[in-house]
Amino acid sequence: MAENNAQNKAKLISETRRRFEAEYVTEKSEKYDSRDVERLQQDDNWVESYLYWRHNVVDETLKMLDESFQWRKEFSVNDLSESSIPRWLLELGGIYLHGYDKEGNKLFWIRVKYHIKDQKTIMDKKKLIAFWLERYAKRENGKPITVMFDMSETGLNSIDMDFVRFIINCFKVYYPKYLSKIVIFDMPWIMNAAFKIVKSWLGPEAVSLLKFTSKNEIQEYVSVEYLPPHMGGTDPFKYSYPPLVDDDFQTPLCENGPIASEDETSSKEDIEGDGKETLETISNEEPPALSEKSNPTESVSKKDENEKVDSKTKTFKKPLSVFKGPLLHISPAEELYFGSIESGEKKTLIVLTNVTKNIVAFKVRTTAPEKYRVKPSNSSCDPGASIDIIVSPHGGLTVSAQDRFLIMAAEMEQSSGTGPAELSQFWKEVPRNKVMEHRLRCHTVESSKPNSLMLKDSISTMSDKTSEDLYLQLNRLLESNRKLEDQLQRSIWFQQLLLALTMVLLDFVVSFFYSLYN
């Protein structure tokens, strides 16, 4: 069955490419960017995303590709950069990428209160949207995104329906299959009619992706660690520019050697989990690769040290999946699997293999630098060699599915040194377009507890969740009750006013007829 589906998908992709080339490119090639046409012939995922959004109907997919490619050329999407956007707009902080929702999707923030409807700036705002989406699409090919419309403190002068429609079209036509959901926070009641129009733009299939929330419901979609305080969250993030804020990856703990107290804590944890093995092999920050100038004595000590590392990492399960990049093969390909706390297997392994003819420098960064220790996190790898990187949660901190790791790699000149000072200088000077990047998600393996213990934990968790749900429902009920009371009071007031006006009118009519007949 799966094989048939794969064959059908391949046929649809091939037919789409062939027909687009024959029916559109020959006549309208000047309307498209040649880079987009070339990418269409090479990137199966890109073609499949358009087919998916048009339910695998090739005729509809071709129309969508035509519209999308014309838009990409009109906006010069492939050439958009920071210099294409007015600096004041980047400094404003109305549109940016930051954080993740509970499903691990990146958050695309639209702070509506910072937008003023103005025909002079609408094109720049649209280009900023396109800039962020294209930047994200190139880094996270095919991974969904959650749009956060923050409408708190929003007035009518901030509502631009043309701009909203453009954002909707970006996900309907220009970046299909990228939309996870649209979360609308604290929408003013006066905008209800306007968003009925938005629903019609989305279409019946995508309407379910629209989530209207207040402070009470927002945590159903985003955890407090990625919500700002005005949404009831604890995220200390404050927007500023420069630099661009979408790079949430930071240096993990102890890149340049652990702090004494932290090292002692880690040593105790490892002694308990691994018997008498020491941390020397995994806390060594020296680059594993040997330079050409190293002497035989150093070579012997390095060899012994590497053998120790090998014996240490034998306790880890080698990842099976492999991402094949131009500089490094990285294993695992997409997800880091950490053992459960109960199993004691908290650490995991990343294997890097240099597939070039030169030394490759690498760095490992993470979205949660306070939670993880990475050894080594900044080093180099000889041609054809492999390096094992050990990643472990720090202390008692737990692994989250929202955590991410970024591996950065760049090819070094043969004459370059690989010491800490040389590596630091190298990363300052290497051009951005020479750096290979690959991202990894985190995943916790289910606990291997006995069923009886699992049942107790499950009952306890269900009890806590039920209590929390009841509390939320009670709050909502009280809020609804308060609104009903307000409406009732207003209704009584209107009835009293109407009664008073009726009495005045009746008195006037009686007086009129009395004066008429007397």
Swiss-Prot record:
Residues 265-279, 300-312 have a biased composition (Basic and acidic residues). CDD domains: SEC14. One of its GO terms (cellular component) is organelle membrane contact site. The chain crosses the membrane at residues 497-518. Residues 327-445 form the MSP domain. InterPro entries: CRAL-TRIO_dom, CRAL-TRIO_dom_sf, CRAL/TRIO_N_dom_sf, ER-organelle_contact, Ig-like_fold, MSP_dom, PapD-like_sf. Residues 365-366 are annotated as: Required for FFAT motif binding and phosphorylated FFAT motif binding. It is found in: Endoplasmic reticulum membrane. Keywords: Chemotaxis, Endoplasmic reticulum, Membrane, Transmembrane, Transmembrane helix. The record marks V374 as: Required for FFAT motif binding. Residues 252-312 are annotated as: Disordered. Residues 85-239 form the CRAL-TRIO domain. It is a single-pass type IV membrane protein. GO terms for biological process: chemotaxis; lipid droplet formation. Residues 1-496 are cytoplasmic. The record marks K363 as: Required for phosphorylated FFAT motif binding. The keyword Endoplasmic reticulum applies. Homooligomer. Interacts (via MSP domain) with STARD3NL (via FFAT motif), RMDN3 (via FFAT motif), OSBPL1A (via FFAT motif) and CERT1 (via FFAT motif). Interacts (via MSP domain) with STARD3 (via phosphorylated FFAT motif); this interaction depends on the critical phosphorylation of STARD3 on 'Ser-209'. Interacts with RB1CC1 (via phosphorylated FFAT motif), MIGA2 (via phosphorylated FFAT motif) and OSBPL1A (via FFAT motif). Endoplasmic reticulum-anchored protein that mediates the formation of contact sites between the endoplasmic (ER) and endosomes, mitochondria or Golgi through interaction with conventional- and phosphorylated-FFAT-containing organelle-bound proteins. In addition, forms endoplasmic reticulum (ER)-lipid droplets (LDs) contacts through a direct protein-membrane interaction and participates in LDs homeostasis. The attachment mechanism involves an amphipathic helix that has an affinity for lipid packing defects present at the surface of LDs. The MSP domain is required for binding to the FFAT motif of target proteins. The CRAL-TRIO domain is necessary for the recruitment to lipid droplets (LDs) and mediates the formation of ER-LDs contacts through an amphipathic helix. This is Motile sperm domain-containing protein 2. It comes from Mus musculus (Mouse). The lineage of its organism: Eukaryota, Metazoa, Chordata, Craniata, Vertebrata.
